[in-house]
Amino acid sequence: MITTETLGARGVAVRAGLHRGWLETKYSLTDVGDIFWMLIFPVSFTVTLLFMRGSTVPGTDLALGAMVLPSLIGMSIAFGGLAGPAMQIATDREDGTLLRAKATPDGMLGYLIGKIWFFGLTTLASLVLLAIPAVTVISDLRIDGRTALLLPVIFVVGMIATVPIGSALGSIFKSSAQSMLIMLASMLLIAISGIFYPITAMPTWLQWVGQVFPFYWLGLGTRSAMMPAGAEAAEIGDSWRTAEMFAVLGVWAVVGLVLAPIVLRRMARRQTGSAIAAAREKIMTRGY
Amino acid sequence: MSDRESATEPTGLALDVRDLRVRYGSNEVLKGVTFSALRGEVVALLGPNGAGKTTTIEVLEGFRMPASGDVSVLGSDPARGDERWRARVGVVLQSWRDHSRWRVRDLLDYHARFYAPYATAEVPRPWDVDELLGVVGLTAHAEQRVMRLSGGQRRRVDVAIGIVGRPELVFLDEPTAGFDPHARREFHELVHRLSDFENTTVLLTTHDLAEAEKLADRILVLDRGAIIADGSPDQLALDLATKAEVRWTVGGERHVHAVEERDPTEFVRRLLATDPDVTELEVKRASLEDTYLALVQRVESGQAEEPEKLEALS
């Protein structure tokens, strides 16, 4: 039964969740380990730029580095939304964070809102950091009204397409150590998603694999928002395929939004103090 | 409608458990547990490790589904407890490394926020965070990160989070595990305060008899999934004591007799009636500690007998 009282309580939980996301972001920005992760993309981009000096996108006189920047932005969105929540949820389940949320009225709602807000904010922070090395190639890019409109939309759609599915994946893994597999899988998918190397230069079957996952489409979307006219010649079908991009990301969003609550609820039901004690025991003896 | 009113049991029972059974696969961990607790009562679930204490408390918290039995916690079935019910129940969890980089005050304040919509005229919710920090003795550590706290301090954070919503009922699973004597004593004072001033019902588990005696109005002894004794610490000593030792002196000679019946009075009466020279009479009943240890031992040796019986049958 939904009454005004429960609606009021939900509203309070959503606000508490936003507060949680903000606090966690603040804590994250003072944590050396987290800052290290946030710096990975900007630093790897800088290194990539150094290696790509003088190279151009095949068939154009565009600097290859200029193509990598938008792709990296897309990848940061996908990575922050997919691998981040997957690993975090596995950890939070093991250390009792989720059980605490369960023991609090509307605590699960607050927790989820907090996570989405947290990953949104930290992903945004790493994108801002990415802008620092980006100034060196900015002259090769087209930053205009279309960018200002498309980039935020892609950011939000990308978050909706990845955070739920990432959370669902995180709840499937039995332990936080297993969730590291997500990291590896993400790396593999990034390699074939046309971010560091044009996807058209890969074997056709690999192109198809790459096009199943959101990494490719987010990279394509951000390229379409920032690359100068004519750059679509380097893409599959000589087109930005904007409609297809939103369609594929939309499918991922729907799958995630349907799947995540089911999987999360199932996982949360299994959470008990003794399950956490068992996990603690295991980690204490094993050391990881 | 006030939720407080509708929830108040006419019987004054905060907890009512009847024939609770829990199974893990084919292993029955709770074999028909029955007990109840009055509002404001402090009840200790005492038993050796593996007795089923944690399983019992997890069912009552609504975190585990029982195989069968009737469970009522503040008038609701915990398996179907809604968020309003959840707001009236406090669960003190054992922290490990969760929220380790949060500052103590932030963490408590975050959890407190969820309870404000559930305040009633009688129960202002939540606790004032600074006041509660004072109550659990963490004022000086309010700005510290959870990971920098000692085990005892961290445990007090757990307690504070568990009671920040001013619950009517609090569950504490092995609350003082890993405490030094000083922290233990402070914690005991906190539990007394909860039951005396806040009229909070407390159910705690422990394997430490001394702690159960110090804290509880009533002790339930659980062993291998069944409650084998239920009563006040004094009652328990009476109920469980099987032996009392009677010592006396006649003509400079010391006598000792172990009375097998529960009540040694009859033996003493006969002794005094038959022998007028008895002096230095002394009746010593086994302490609750002796009784508990004997009981644990008895159950353990009973466990060893079962396979032998099986062998004899086959």
Question: Model features per residue range: what roles?
Answer:
Chain A
Residues 30-55, 65-84, 124-126, 183-193, ...:
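Hydrophobic alpha-helical transmembrane segments of multi-pass membrane transport/permease proteins
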Residues 44-48, 65-137:
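Hydrophobic alpha-helical transmembrane segments of multi-pass membrane transport proteins
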Residues 1-41, 269, 273, 287:
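Aromatic- and glycine-rich beta-strand/loop motifs that create alpha-glucan
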Residues 2-4, 243-288:
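Junction motif at the cytosolic side of a transmembrane helix
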Residues 193-256:
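Membrane-interfacial helix-loop-helix junctions in multi-pass membrane proteins
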Residues 59-88, 154-164, 171, 260-261:
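Hydrophobic alpha-helical transmembrane segments of membrane proteins
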Residues 108, 113-187, 242-246, 250, ...:
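Alpha-helical transmembrane segments and their short interhelical loops
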Residues 48-56, 170-216:
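Transmembrane helix segments
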